[in-house]
Amino acid sequence: MGRLILEHTLQGHKGRIWGVAWHPKGNVFASCGEDKAIRVWSLSGNTWSTKTILSDGHKRTIREIRWSPCGQYLASASFDATTAIWSKSSGEFECNATLEGHENEVKSVSWSRSGGLLATCSRDKSVWIWEVAGDDEFECAAVLNAHTQDVKRVVWHPTKDILASASYDNTIKMFAESQLDSDWDCTATLSSHTSTVWSIDFDAEGDRLVSCSDDKTLKIWRAYHPGNDAGIATPDKQSVWKCVCTLSGQHSRAIYDVSWCKLTGLIATGCGDDGIRIFKETSDSKRDEPTFEQLTAEETAHEQDVNAVEWNPAVAGQLISCSDDGTIKIWKVDD
């Protein structure tokens, strides 16, 4: 049985911490929160410390931050309805671009695998796709109004230019660029949750997605592509996503975040009951009927809601979390 071992507890932000994001190299991370500031932390020896505080980019709470795949840029999504792009090209972090267009709070931001596209989503129910048009130039490529409520999260597929979004309307939607006319279309709607879908994450290959919800469940979805050997029909030659597993009974409140480790296959959740839980696919799991077990849980990981969890992309088994309690914690799963 694996255990979750606490390695570091870090403080610095004032108020609740909404987001944490590992740098692709895994030796730096960024955090953001209610204090309108971004902190960039780095590891020196065995000590994590704040190297930079970026406090002049936003007028309201910063909800989420994400590093570009190349690690040169940091995007921040804020309740002030803007997304800021930061880079260190001059040696110090500077805000190089501010993306405007959403009518309300921006809830999430995500870079495509190539770094050539950026997605944002908002309480205004829309998902925007931006093209990186050159140095610090971003052009709106699409405004997608497929959701009927607040959109909570956007995440790009790990190998293709497919975007997934999760919403207060209880659904997840998939978007892809049409091969006919370069318009972005909604290619799938994933319906099974009975309340807000707070977060989503793809597995390493991108053929499966995990979602977490206000309904206290985790769901695993699988893509069935045209010509699949399971005999699943694919109308219009579009991939069909089916819910193949539901995990319930482990969480006592809303699950706010989920992270699927690309290195180990473990799934971590951050919950409104202050806990962090780790799930592992069982050895006898079937492709079309997968089974997962709870590997370990830290029921009181934080003193208040756990807002975000993310596996380190470079260090297997290392997890970061942040909370309304104003702390960031770094954990290690001991197998």
Curated annotation (Swiss-Prot):
Essential component of the cytosolic iron-sulfur (Fe/S) protein assembly machinery. Required for the maturation of extramitochondrial Fe/S proteins. It comes from Drosophila pseudoobscura pseudoobscura (Fruit fly). InterPro entries: CIAO1/Cia1 (IPR028608), G-protein_beta_WD-40_rep (IPR020472), WD40/YVTN_repeat-like_dom_sf (IPR015943), WD40_repeat_CS (IPR019775), WD40_repeat_dom_sf (IPR036322), WD40_rpt (IPR001680). GO terms for cellular component: cytosolic [4Fe-4S] assembly targeting complex. PANTHER family: CYTOSOLIC IRON-SULFUR PROTEIN ASSEMBLY PROTEIN CIAO1-RELATED (PTHR19920:SF0), WD40 PROTEIN CIAO1 (PTHR19920). GO terms for biological process: iron-sulfur cluster assembly; protein maturation. WD repeats lie at residues 12-51, 57-96, 101-140, 146-185, 192-231, 250-289, 301-335. This is Probable cytosolic iron-sulfur protein assembly protein Ciao1. SMART domains: WD40. Belongs to the WD repeat CIA1 family. The keyword Ribosomal protein does not apply. The keyword Repeat applies. It comes from the Eukaryota. Keywords: Repeat, WD repeat. It holds the Pfam family WD40.
